[in-house]
Amino acid sequence: MSVQDVLWIVLTVQLSFGLAYFENNQRTQDYDVDKNGSVHHKNWVRNEMMDSLGLYWLKWWINANENSIYFEVTVHTRGFAGLGFSKDGRLARADMVLMWVDDATGHPNVLDCHGALHPSSGPPLQDDTQNYDVLDGKQNGTHTILKFKRKIETCDPFDIPLSADTFKVLWSIGENDPIHGNLDWQGQSRGVKALQLFSPMFTKNSHSIEGIQKWDITVNNVTIDRSMDTLYWCKIVRLPELTGKQHIIGYEPLLSGKYERNVVHHMTLFECQSKIYSGSDPSSWDLWVRSAGTVCNSNLLTPRDWDSCSTPVAVWSLGSDGQFLPPHAGIPMGGASGVSYYMLEIHYDNPDGKESVDHSGFRIHYTPNLRTYDSGILISGVSISETQLIPPGQKKYRSVGICGPSCSSVMFPKDGIKIISGTLHSHQAGRTISLRHVRSGKELNPIIVDENYDYRHQKVHQLANETVVLPGDYLITDCSYETKYRKRPTFGGYSTKEEMCLTFITYYPKIEMSGCYSMTPVREFFEMFRVYQFYSLNMTDVENMFLYNSDYTDYSKQAKNATNKPNSGKTSKEDVIYQESLLNKLVISDPAEFHDRTFLSHLNQLPWHDPLFTKRVEQAFITGTHMTFCRVSKDSLSIPSEIIRYPEFTAYVKPPAACLNYLFTDNEELRSGSSQFFTDFTLSLLLLIQLGLQTTLL
């Protein structure tokens, strides 16, 4: 037997231990049902395998009465284990804990630490105040298990307050117990995993659910050429032969190749309504099933019938593990639904210009054992269009997408829909995203908030408490972006260098609606920048190009071309996006002071460096008019679009932080030990100043 065979056996045994531990430590989740029928999950427990081999398992749950979070770590070592919480995945400024069971005494140890302030400043530093309480610890010949807890907010400037945001959870495994005074984090294995600590997670437990079947849907030999920066590929598939209605209970990604090198950015599986257009040939669908697929959203290559593939049933984005639904909900398939065909859409992002061949897709888990409710997925947010504009050089700039009464009053049932979960989606510039909820002129608690959004880690936000959205309510997807190092405006679009602002909402009961979007009306978008007319194109033509993806050449035979200076340097992929932009083809005729400029050139000359100007533009887009769209499953656009103003409402105010000390966690001068005096002195000084101001006012 070779050394490789022995290593493989060892790894297999370790992974089997980990999976067995996972299966045996899943606590049945209790729940309450309120007067509105919403489910509130309680006593939930999360269990995550932190590495790919099952060497490190992290289990946790929240005790709301104590305002505490409990952890249990099971690690394949008799040495130390490290755990840390970070906003960006770096050791610097991370909130960390080192733990071990003493080999000599059997005593469990948990040490509260923090990362150095600079990446090159050495090992972790011990906190002055220890805020982690060890509860239990033991080890055998191979494994160490430690249980401990901490407050969600500790009021220690060197700890990070935990929240519903996406955290980068650091982990490390060491072969030996730490030597006194040596807090070196660099163990034999270490890594980072993005987690949402406040979200329960549902799983497919093979011991308790019978009759689960799987349906694998993948593309076949899709070639991503070196020259392709962005590719959207669509493939039609047919539903398997089923005996009546079934319920999809969850789905997982099937990714070809090593994950780190994979170019798949996101995937969506859509239902198709095969009889939606008059003149459609039903036999064409079976021909498309046998084909390899084609480029999506192409006027030349994509069949018009594929526009009917609009209702999502599975959504995956970079960093996600997929989703399993709670036990009372399932997405229907087969039976009387009339849906026989589905479309798999895959977005390939290839910034490094590598050639690859892909076979990715979904594994759908379904069962004939129907659940209580039919569930669905709908998309809400900003309609993907170049009328979404993010100026360059911005630390924080917001865009909003509105789903208003034109959809909710018409499509939602009397008792509303109940939101189970949501996946927030933007591209590289996205920094924070929230799904806001407005009813009767008052903003309610946000449904989902992620103030540490990372487009590389787009996990499902599973709600511990389902949210009821009633007819007449507003859903607002609110995104903020950072473009500090960009020199030109960023627009809405399909490339990761362009932007999106979307929420994929999983809910029940299922309704015949696939999407609810808004955008700045086209005419108002141009008038915002004092542009009123283009050569040989009236504004109606321009609106049609934006709203219906019409080809510019259909309207531009007499259009005047602007004189653009040739690019003498190397053309980047961003340059290509700008050159192909519709905004770069529209040449201004009115007003005269801007004539013969392309609209894109006009935007590049605006004073984006002026914060007052940029803030006015941001507020004008947010609080101005919005064109809303309600996409209904049974028709391509059966509810007319509507132009509305941003709703007036009393905004939700986030409760103040319990601890002022957290305001100083990013201070470059903050140090352990003597720095506590500096922190306390500064807080006291601020308090005295505030009291002095109050006295003056009195």
Swiss-Prot record:
Cofactor binding description: Binds 2 copper ions per subunit.
Cofactors that this protein relies on: Cu(2+)
GO BP: dopamine catabolic process; norepinephrine biosynthetic process; octopamine biosynthetic process
Location within or outside the cell: Secreted
Coiled-coil ranges per UniProt: none
Broad class of the protein's primary localization: secreted
EC number(s) on file: 1.14.17.-
Entry binding sites for Cu cation A: 265-266, 347
Single GO MF annotation: copper ion binding
Keyword Protein transport among record annotations: no
UniProt keyword Signal, yes or no: yes
One Pfam match: DOMON
Catalytic-site annotation from UniProt: 232, 425
Residue pairs linked by disulfide bridges in the UniProt entry: 272-309, 403-516, 479-501
Glycosylation sites: 36, 140, 221, 465, 538, 561
Protein name: MOXD1 homolog 1
